Amino acid sequence: MTNESNTPLPPLALSVRQPWAWAIIHGGKTIENRTLGAIRTGNMDCRTICIHAATGMREKEYRWAVWKLQSIDVALPPPADLIRGGIIGTVDVVDIVIEKTCPESHKPWFGGPYGLLLENPKPLEPIPAVGELGYFKWEAAVAFKPPASWMSRYVPKMEGNGTLGLFDDLPIAFETPPEKPFGTSKRSKK
């Protein structure tokens, strides 16, 4: 498989949930957070890889990402516009970092405990592909995942902490962040 300039694409890809895959290629996201176990079992190392936009994305994840990215001046496209189930670009993995070795300029993206340090994102004309865990050899597929019904009718919920509808040309603003849709284990809820 080649890109528009007939350069061969990297044979390995990393599947990343949207909207974070978009943020890597278009939004300046320079760290892809992973556990050490995921890095080891996924055979992740430093090389140029394709970024695969995974098929999964829930409304709570998207809403939280809107808030998170807005806090660092990155505006997300509407959820229905995000490719899911395909290769969307390439990036160089240049290091594997922990918090104390993560360069200060990359800290807004670091959520730990480990991260792949990314450079040189290059968007591609999207190519449908099925994702896997870790680095995987990708092959072109037949079609992208169509938008879920919530994505096509998405209007951010106010829940008392957002301002919407009055000035549609302004970005969504939150006084407080939406509930974080991940990161709490069942054990911590006891």
Spans of features found by a protein language model:
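Structured alpha/beta reader/binder surfaces that contact nucleic acids or chromatin modification marks
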Residues: 2-190
